[in-house]
């Protein structure tokens, strides 16, 4: 009878402990799922990013110049064309009409840093535009959108028109964030959106950006140290390549205006010499006291003095022109890189969490198991004493 009661009690102990078993198993499973999920997430994010950048041939390096990129700049950069595919383009920061919202308008690329079309199509002719996809709830295809722009240093607008017809909505392969798009030289100073227009919409003698996609890292994982090291090496090479270009470009910029000033100075000196001769002749002949002759000579002297002042101002203005600057950016350093950096950082955060969070869950599960088993043993010890008695 006692044996029967004993086994009945054992079965009852197991059945009454189902909740404890399920709780411990759930905690262990949660730790396992967290471990697997967090370990898998960073590689998946990196794979997704790599596939996206490869599909759109996102530029590994970009080069910009404060005075744009003229033919001599292009000839210099084309020296690395055997190592990289190079594409030149335009961009301009503008302000959405009747607001302070800054937009960056890019020229439509051919092959490098292309766009993902979310809805509609890319612009194909002048006067058309595709907006960033975050604006598809505010605008629809076929709507008109207008911008205003600040004049360039030459007093001219860079854009041929400022009102466009929306043809679609896109996502950039360079600007990954939809919230923090970086700073802007227009409007409030904070970039609110971007758009792409045909290259023919720009009216500029120089390109504004060069994009380089290197062949040795074309399909590489951009989140690896190998990719970083290779791109860093290419960046150093480009910086050395453009090191002397600021002085050369400044000399180039000043050449024609300086030649014009020198020519005008020479002509002025000739005119001044002729005037002095006429003045001496007038004095010799006594005509210098003639009111009419005096008036003509005085007018000529005033004109020469005015011309001298104009030449002086032109020379001072020319001398004040600063050397242009050239900037070489990686994907992480570009002025619109916030989204890229955030994506990379998030992948790294998940990687770090995968090394910590599951351990905490396993520790909690072990602690709960220890406490539960301790109580269970204590209960069974009491029952064992009862049976023994």
Where are these regions (language model features)?
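Membrane transport/envelope proteins' first extracytoplasmic loop
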Residues: 3-363
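Interfacial "coupling" helices/loops that link adjacent transmembrane helices in transporter permeases
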Residues: 9, 17, 367-389
